[in-house]
Curated annotation (Swiss-Prot):
UniProt record, GO biological process: translation
PANTHER family recorded: 50S RIBOSOMAL PROTEIN L4, LARGE RIBOSOMAL SUBUNIT PROTEIN UL4M
Family recorded in the similarity comment: Belongs to the universal ribosomal protein uL4 family.
Assembly description: Part of the 50S ribosomal subunit.
Classification via NCBIfam families: rplD_bact (TIGR03953)
Gene3D superfamilies: 3.40.1370.10
Record's function text: One of the primary rRNA binding proteins, this protein initially binds near the 5'-end of the 23S rRNA. It is important during the early stages of 50S assembly. It makes multiple contacts with different domains of the 23S rRNA in the assembled 50S subunit and ribosome.
Name the UniProt record assigns to this protein: Large ribosomal subunit protein uL4
GO molecular function: rRNA binding; structural constituent of ribosome
Region Disordered, residue ranges: 43-100
Stretch forming the signal peptide: none
UniProt keyword list: Ribonucleoprotein, Ribosomal protein, RNA-binding, rRNA-binding
GO cellular component, one term: ribosome
Length: 215
């Protein structure tokens, strides 16, 4: 089975259609797999630079505050113990790497599932370009996207050389623009609709379909 979507122009006309291979856009989504991949992707974004000081790292506290016996108070060896104000932290966070190793096949399968979910709900769109001409226009791009979907969160996938399109949508709230080689599960699931330029869609299909890989 092969899905088809109409290719729209900024003028609002239909310029043919493009096929969405079933192997990429009509697979059964694996919810658990997509969750695992997205969790790993978000974990990898964490800086992990958080740090607290233990009682051995806090400045001061080298002298025993008072004698061991005879004061009537509990024995203390340092004013930098965790029960004191200004003392060290017990089991506090230290710098660490949160990234997880996720096999490439799992990442690719999760992306196929996410795209298939959007395709089944008619939330994948194809366009010739975002604006006509060689002059960026945020107003024109916003109007054009509004004709494609009423949803606010849109993922735009265009070629790396399409600077006019990138400049036209980069300041639009709720719109995230990436190139086809940057396509990932989180961005697809985080967006309500995915808008491909024909160039970007063909690039993704040729790079990931079995037919494209054999060419």
């Amino acid at each position: 089975m092969t899905l088809k979507v109409d290719v729209k122009t900024p003028a609002g006309k239909t310029d043919g259609s493009v096929e969405l291979p079933a192997e990429l856009f009509d697979v059964e989504p694996n919810i658990a797999l997509m969750h695992q991949v997205v969790t790993a992707q978000l974990a990898a974004k964490r800086q992990g630079t958080h740090s607290t000081k233990t009682r051995g790292e806090v400045s001061g506290g080298g002298k025993k505050p008072y004698r061991q016996k005879g004061s009537g108070r509990a024995r203390q060896g340092s004013t930098r113990a965790p029960q004191f104000t200004g003392g060290g932290t017990v089991h506090g966070p230290k710098p660490r790497d949160y990234s997880q190793r996720t096999p490439k096949k799992m990442i690719a399968a999760a992306l196929r599932g996410a795209l298939s979910d959007r395709a089944r709900n008619d939330r994948i769109h194809a366009v010739t370009e975002l604006v006509e001409g060689q002059t960026p226009s945020t107003k024109s791009a916003k109007t054009f996207l509004g004709t494609l979907t009423e949803n606010k969160k849109v993922l735009v996938v265009i070629g790396r050389t399409d600077e006019v399109g990138a400049k036209s949508v980069r300041n639009l709230p709720g719109v995230h623009v990436i190139s086809p080689d940057q396509l990932n599960t989180y961005d697809v699931l985080n967006a309500d609709d995915v808008v491909f330029s024909v160039e970007a869609l063909n690039a993704y299909i040729s790079a990931n379909s079995k037919e494209g890989a054999s060419v």
